[in-house]
Amino acid sequence: MATMDRQSYAQMFGPTTGDRVRLGDTDIWIQVEKDFTVYGDEVKFGGGKVIRDGMGQSQVTNEIAVDLVITNALVLDHWGIVKGDVGIKDGRIFKVGKAGNPDVQDNVDIVVGPGTEVIAGEGSILTAGGIDAHIHFICPQQVEEALTSGVTTMIGGGTGPATGTKATTCTSGPWYLGKMLQATDSMPMNLGFLGKGNASLPEALEEQLEAGACGLKLHEDWGTTPASIDCCLSVAEAYDVQVAIHTDTLNESGFVDSTIDAFKDRVIHTYHTEGAGGGHAPDIIQACSNPNVLPSSTNPTRPYTHNTVDEHLDMLMVCHHLDSNIEEDVAFADSRIRKETIAAEDILHDRGAFSMISSDSQAMGRVGEVVTRTWQTAHKMKQQFGLLPEDQELGADNFRARRYIAKYTINPAIAHGISHEVGSIEPGKMADLVLWKPAFFAVKPSMIIKGGMIASAPMGDPNASIPTPQPVHYRPMFGSCGKAAAATSVTFVSKAALNNGLKESLGLERTLVACKNTRNISKLDMIHNDWLPNITVDPQTYEVRADGELLTCEPAETLPLAQLYTLF
């Protein structure tokens, strides 16, 4: 029997069971748990390789064969870290398994035919497209920036650089909802718009959901009072949509307990639950003790570094229309920035008490850094606290990696009722996938696949004789062009809007998909991120304790996935 040494095998077909891969220049290492291939029957494309007629390619039509196969990829998802071929058919994930020609190869469950395209995944990591559930739609250029970072779904609100949008994630009113649905129809991105949820009577909220909102957003700048919270959640319960909330920093209409009481045990997504992005000062962080609260962070506080506190004050003054000449405005800003709660946020993420990470795009957050900041946090926690208990036996960071990737993939999908379509690499879901070379993981993807088509990729000089000559930069690919962008993307709306014939009335090209199962979930549904500690905050010192344990850590002086990768 012919054999190959492990290093040669990895160079030709990628890592296999038991091999370890470093993620970028972080201290996070993942180990291959399973390899779906049959040794000796691997498929690979190229001159003199396997995927040729009568060899790894069968004779069947695309009734049986897949449209696309990504060969020998290392899949990193919330459910595991495995090596395999990934089949894509009709823009959706067909299977993670063994590709090839069943006429001549064993254990083939992804059939390659003459109608099958190939993407070489050897030596690459494949992840689900990211979901950013805290978007201020301030400018359309955010979509390209997010896409090239590995995000394929954006949920939030806004109408452009209006003052309200720059502060709050709300697309206010039926007219603006319709116009934003039309404006984004041909963008290569899944989208969902949140209507304004601040009202004490239901009618104005109901009409927004019927006009295409996928949920509602409560924001303190519009008045997040107990009455508006109760009304908004009551409407959400009736329409099966999620509510996102930015609570009352100034504690004008009540304290954190007043807000939690107004929830009445109904599920809610709490934005920037640490508080620097806004929320009851100084103790909004304790909201994540509650099983009905789905807590997320925004990326400027991810992770805690020696620059974090300093950059936040000016950021906050601009985003919330404050005046540095007004003493009360400065005091308002100061009350939100606390190094103690930011440090605790790192640890709460690492232990799974905070469930999601998002951007807060151009409104105290960076739309292209959700993925990067997530893995920088994982690295910092590994450096400061070592392996998680769940990883001790393996000696690699598999559980930590699965915990952190869930924060920007499956968990926001579950929270907003879209996990039946996106959020993981599982059969039947949209083929929204991101391919990474391990050395560039979490900072520079090598390919972004949207609904089965390549939507964006680094590309060299279009006049060159090969694709790689400089200047190489991210460019839109065919999946971003023409009607394909709409055909490979969806917009999430309420079931009521879908049943109202909204697509036809607005003349939309893309498919509308209803959110569902948003009201029957809890934090226990947040995969790998469901810890419910009893959190307390000292009102004088801002010290944070979880089940009595003081949560504190030092700020990072340097981070991976940073200037090493972004010289230009």
From Swiss-Prot:
Q: Provide the top EC class.
A: hydrolase
Its annotated pathway reads: Nitrogen metabolism; urea degradation; CO(2) and NH(3) from urea (urease route): step 1/1
Q: How is the cofactor bound?
A: Binds 2 nickel ions per subunit.
User: According to its UniProt record, how is this protein modified after translation?
Assistant: Carboxylation allows a single lysine to coordinate two nickel ions.
Query: Could you say which residues form the signal peptide?
Result: none
Question: Per UniProt, where does Ni(2+) 1 bind?
Answer: H134, H136, K217, D360
* Residues annotated with N6-carboxylysine modification: K217
Which cofactor(s) are needed, names only?
Answer: Ni cation
The alphabetical list of record keywords is: Cytoplasm, Hydrolase, Metal-binding, Nickel
Catalytic activity reads:
urea + 2 H2O + H(+) = hydrogencarbonate + 2 NH4(+)
Enzyme Commission identifier(s): 3.5.1.5
Which residues are named in the active-site annotation?
A: H320 (proton donor)
GO CC terms for this protein?
Answer: cytoplasm
**Binding-site residues for Ni(2+) 2, renumbered to this chain:** K217, H246, H272
Question: Which family, according to the similarity comment?
Answer: Belongs to the metallo-dependent hydrolases superfamily. Urease alpha subunit family.
Please name the PANTHER family in this protein's record. Answer: UREASE (PTHR43440:SF1)
Q: What is this protein called?
A: Urease subunit alpha
